[in-house]
Structure formats: structure tokens, C-alpha cells
């Protein structure tokens, strides 16, 4: 057990090293710092209370798996060096380099991004809960590229089968915006060639999936629930395809600042089609193109997008509510209704119980949903 210090808990470089089964607590800088190396295994470590980064690494061909990283960059814990010197300081896990795999980690209560990566990497089967608690304009999972269009360093990256629940953002110390900006999955400036597939994103103050000045992204089979806007595409540079996603809006955004929207788009030659949209509370102003809000029909007419997509605008029945259920383990889980009456998004009723495979989710509507247990 490595406990407290003014710098790093563990600092390492080299090749074919293993960092496993350590408990690292309350270091002012980084919990684990890998300055360079390849074929390194970082697994099953518990890192808590680091102020700059939980895990901070510059590696290639390495694996980060089964780690629990929590309470990174929490305001009340900050020391004389604050959050660190970089704009991206405060992230739970930061990995830079090619061909790393970041999987099966639990990243809880991060001051800035939950998981941030640079260059070509695979991020899969992670649970990110509560990010951007100290800093704003970040994401549960975040990437960008230092190499400009069209040579994105992120090309070939995959973000799949992750669950992101709770990205709050904060207005403390920043008054330009009226609402906090916590993004679920955030592909930022010049990120390109990233596949975002089969993720679940919920409870974000800003957008579930945010594409900002990026390009050639493939966004498929994701579930987005309870965000300001399910998808935001801002200045896409072209080649992006968005399909087969479930975007589910509640009555108001999580901060109760506006009507929740399904898709917002500002510029960019993209393809959006074959998605499932749900908005039980309002049919107007749930899509946005540049500065104008539209209904689903108006959106399709103005953009030519979503020709084969569906949008459920039916009102909930008396006493009905909606809820998201997910499985963050690597085993199948059975959920029991215990008297609840529940229906899936496709209208199929649930009887008795339902199963969820690892890192999958389901949205149910009905009565008595709080009775459901596993």
C-alpha cells in the first residue's frame, strides 16, 4: 500500500513490465506514472485521491485492465500544485501512444475526464461514473488529435461496450456559459477515424455523444438516455456516419434548463440514418439545425437525414415512468420485475424478469419500475 506523497505514487518506464494489485492513495500528483514504454501490463490496481491524474501513461502496445480509479482531482483534496499544469489535468485515466487497450476499469468520481486517450487505442468494457466534478467542458470518455485534418492520430481507435453514467460539469470559476458542459463521449478537435459502438451514456448535463470539429467517425448501436442533447455534431469535417442508435430524451435536460433535444447539428457533411428516437413529452423543438429547432418531420425535411429512422412521440400512460437499467459486470445479470409492469422501447412487454449481457443496457417504460431488482 503506497500512501500519500507530494509527487507520484509509482513511477516507471521500460518494456515488459507489470504493475499489478497495488493500492495507491492520496498522492498530490499522479497515482501511477508511466513515462514511456511498451508491452506493459497495468492491472487490478486501486488508485484513489490523486490530484493531477489517477493513471498517467505514455506507452504503446500496453494493457490497462481491471483498475479502480477514484476521487481524482477532487476540489476539497487539492494541494499546493492544484490540478496540475496541463489543460487535461484532472482526468482519472490518461493514456497517450498507439495500440494500447484500456478495458474493464472502473473510473469513479473524476475531477475532469474519466478516461482520456490520445492516438490510436481501444477503450472497451469500462464503467465511468461521475466525471467533470471539478472542471468543465470534458467527457466521460474524451479524445482529440494533435495532428490536423486529414491525418488524425486517433484513426483506427475504437470506443465500445462502455457505460458512462453521470458527467456533471461545473460553473465554478467560469461564468461565460450559463449551464455546465459535461459530455458523455467527446470526440474533440481533429479527432478522426474513431468507431463509437455499443456504448451506454446517461445523465449528462450537456450531450450524450459530442462530435466537435472531427471527421470520419462511425457512431453505431449506442444508447443515450437523459442528456441535454442526445447527439451534438458541431463542425464535422466530413465522412461521419451515425446509425442504429437509441436516443432517448426526457422532459427536460438534467439541469432543467431547457427542453431535452434528440439531435443538434451545426455544419458538416454527415450521414444520419436508421436511428431510434424517443421523446414522450414534446414533439416540437426536439431537433436543432444551426440555430433553429424543429420537429422530427421538420428536421428530416430540412436536413435530408434520418429517412429510415423512427421517432416515438407518444405520451406515457397514467402513472407510467421510464428508467434505464445496465450491467457493468463481466457476467450476465438477471433483473426481476417484482410486480412492476414494463415494456421495452420496441413495444414488447417484459414478463417476470429480463437478462442483460455484460456492458449492455435497456430502457423500460411502465409502472412500479423502482421495484425492479437484480
Predicted regions and their residues:
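Right-handed parallel beta-helix
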Residues: 1-4, 16-29, 38-53, 60-83, ...
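Extracellular beta-strand/beta-solenoid scaffold signature
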Residues: 4-10, 26-34, 49-56, 78-94, ...
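Short, solvent-exposed coil/turn segments
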Residues: 40, 86-88, 100, 136, ...
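Extracellular, surface-exposed repeat architectures
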Residues: 93, 101, 108-109, 136, ...
Amino acid at each position: 500500500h503506497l500512501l500519500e506523497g507530494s509527487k507520484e505514487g509509482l513511477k516507471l518506464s521500460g518494456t515488459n513490465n507489470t504493475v499489478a494489485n497495488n493500492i495507491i492513495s492520496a498522492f498530490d500528483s499522479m497515482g501511477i506514472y508511466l513515462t514511456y514504454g511498451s508491452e506493459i501490463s497495468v492491472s487490478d490496481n486501486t488508485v484513489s485521491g490523486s490530484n493531477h491524474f489517477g493513471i498517467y501513461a505514455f506507452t504503446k502496445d500496453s494493457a490497462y485492465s481491471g483498475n479502480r480509479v477514484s476521487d481524482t482531482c477532487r476540489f476539497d483534496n487539492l494541494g499546493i500544485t492544484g490540478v496540475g499544469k496541463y489543460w487535461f489535468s484532472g482526468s482519472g485515466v490518461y493514456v497517450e501512444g498507439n495500440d494500447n487497450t484500456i478495458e474493464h476499469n472502473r473510473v469513479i468520481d473524476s475531477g475532469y475526464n474519466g478516461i482520456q486517450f490520445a492516438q490510436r487505442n481501444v477503450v472497451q468494457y469500462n464503467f465511468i461514473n461521475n466525471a467533470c466534478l471539478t472542471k468543465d467542458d470534458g467527457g466521460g470518455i474524451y479524445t482529440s488529435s494533435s495532428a490536423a485534418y486529414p491525418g488524425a492520430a486517433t484513426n483506427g481507435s475504437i470506443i465500445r461496450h462502455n457505460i458512462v453514467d453521470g458527467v456533471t460539469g461545473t460553473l465554478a470559476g467560469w461564468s461565460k456559459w450559463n449551464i455546465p458542459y459535461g459530455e458523455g463521449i467527446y470526440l474533440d478537435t481533429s479527432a478522426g477515424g474513431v468507431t463509437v459502438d455499443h456504448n451506454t451514456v446517461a445523465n449528462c448535463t450537456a450531450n450524450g455523444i459530442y462530435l466537435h470539429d472531427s471527421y470520419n467517425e462511425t457512431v453505431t448501436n449506442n444508447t443515450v438516455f437523459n442528456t441535454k442533447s442526445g447527439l451534438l455534431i458541431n463542425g464535422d469535417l466530413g465522412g461521419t456516419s451515425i446509425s442504429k442508435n437509441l436516443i432517448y430524451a426526457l422532459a427536460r435536460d438534467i439541469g432543467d434548463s431547457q427542453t431535452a433535444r434528440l439531435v443538434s447539428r451545426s455544419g458538416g457533411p454527415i450521414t444520419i440514418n436508421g436511428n431510434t428516437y424517443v421523446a414522450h413529452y414534446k414533439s416540437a423543438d426536439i431537433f436543432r439545425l444551426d440555430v433553429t429547432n424543429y420537429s422530427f418531420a421538420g428536421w428530416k425535411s430540412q436536413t435530408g437525414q434520418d429517412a429510415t429512422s423512427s421517432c416515438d412521440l407518444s405520451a406515457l400512460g397514467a402513472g407510467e415512468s421510464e428508467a434505464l437499467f445496465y450491467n457493468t459486470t463481466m457476467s450476465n445479470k438477471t433483473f426481476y420485475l417484482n410486480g412492476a409492469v414494463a415494456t421495452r422501447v420496441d413495444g414488447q412487454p417484459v414478463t417476470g424478469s429480463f437478462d442483460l449481457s455484460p456492458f449492455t443496457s435497456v430502457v423500460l417504460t411502465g409502472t412500479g419500475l423502482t421495484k425492479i431488482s437484480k
